[in-house]
């Protein structure tokens, strides 16, 4: 009898050790799962935050934005319908130590139903002290067409500006919700949030970018979704997408694009 008691006691202790160990493993697994869910949750929040504007792509007629409402907060003055800002910029390093970029920004005032902006050509240098070269050409939007307000002698440049298309006019993000396992970077003190995805060259948006720009890099690009500000919405911060085709110093290539809604600067009628 004493032998059986000792045996049962020993078995009970062993079972308890196994159970405690099992509970520890279960807790570890739960922690891992909770951490995964937390990461997935932020990833979903980032995508949902972007979907509020990317679901509008492609915007065939930019003047449709005059009738589109965006996120509003206490930064808006009474009666201000707000202003949409759309921008697309392409940058490429064509020489060691230099980065050339061209792009356009357009501000669409919903109060006055007018849109003005700039086409910018810029060269920046790695060399300390060497000043950035930049030239801005004023533009406006009339009947969904870009109209130059400055005289441009170069016919090729004039044609390029007048026929410029923002990425948002031909991009399509209907599959955004299917993007998975992104590389997530978060700093809630700033705050900012980023999700990065490797996108295949067969992707429709990537194909269109390669058609429209002199992209020589062959490898698949990285798509970055960047939020600066409250992930739930803010008129102070901004959201930007960026396709990086190459980070090689002599062939660095990327395209950045954003569509944001905010208070009209200077007043409702400016």
Curated annotation (Swiss-Prot):
Belongs to the staphylococcal tandem lipoprotein family. GO terms for cellular component: plasma membrane. InterPro entries: Csa (IPR007595), Csa_sf (IPR038641). A lipid is attached at residue 23 (S-diacylglycerol cysteine). This is Uncharacterized lipoprotein SAB0396. A lipid is attached at residue 23 (N-palmitoyl cysteine). It is found in: Cell membrane. Its main location: membrane. It is a lipid-anchor. Residues 1-22 form the signal peptide. Pfam families: DUF576. Keywords: Cell membrane, Lipoprotein, Membrane, Palmitate, Signal.
């Amino acid at each position: 009898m004493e032998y059986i008691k000792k045996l049962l006691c020993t078995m009970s202790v062993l079972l308890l050790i196994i159970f405690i160990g099992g509970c520890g493993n279960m807790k570890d697994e739960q922690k891992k799962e909770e951490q995964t869910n937390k990461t997935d949750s932020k990833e979903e929040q980032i995508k949902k935050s972007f979907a509020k504007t990317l679901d509008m792509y492609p915007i065939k007629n930019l003047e449709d934005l005059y009738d589109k409402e965006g996120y509003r907060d206490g930064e808006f003055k009474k009666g201000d319908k707000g202003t949409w800002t759309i921008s697309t910029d392409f940058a490429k390093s064509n020489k060691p130590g230099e980065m050339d970029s061209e792009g356009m920004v357009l501000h669409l005032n919903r109060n006055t139903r007018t849109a003005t902006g700039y086409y910018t050509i810029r060269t920046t240098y790695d060399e300390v002290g060497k000043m950035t070269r930049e030239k801005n050409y004023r533009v406006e939007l009339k009947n969904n067409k870009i109209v130059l307000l400055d005289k441009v002698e170069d016919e090729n440049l004039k044609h390029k500006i007048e026929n410029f298309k923002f990425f948002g006019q031909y991009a399509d993000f209907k599959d955004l919700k299917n993007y998975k396992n992104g590389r997530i970077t978060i700093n809630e003190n700033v705050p900012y949030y980023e999700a990065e995805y490797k996108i295949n060259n067969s992707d429709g948006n990537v194909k269109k970018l390669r058609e429209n720009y002199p992209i020589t890099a062959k490898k698949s690009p990285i798509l970055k979704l960047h939020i600066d500000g409250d992930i739930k919405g803010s008129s102070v911060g901004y959201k930007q997408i960026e396709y990086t085709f190459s980070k090689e110093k002599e062939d660095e290539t990327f395209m950045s694009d954003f569509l944001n809604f905010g208070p009209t600067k200077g007043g409702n009628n400016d």
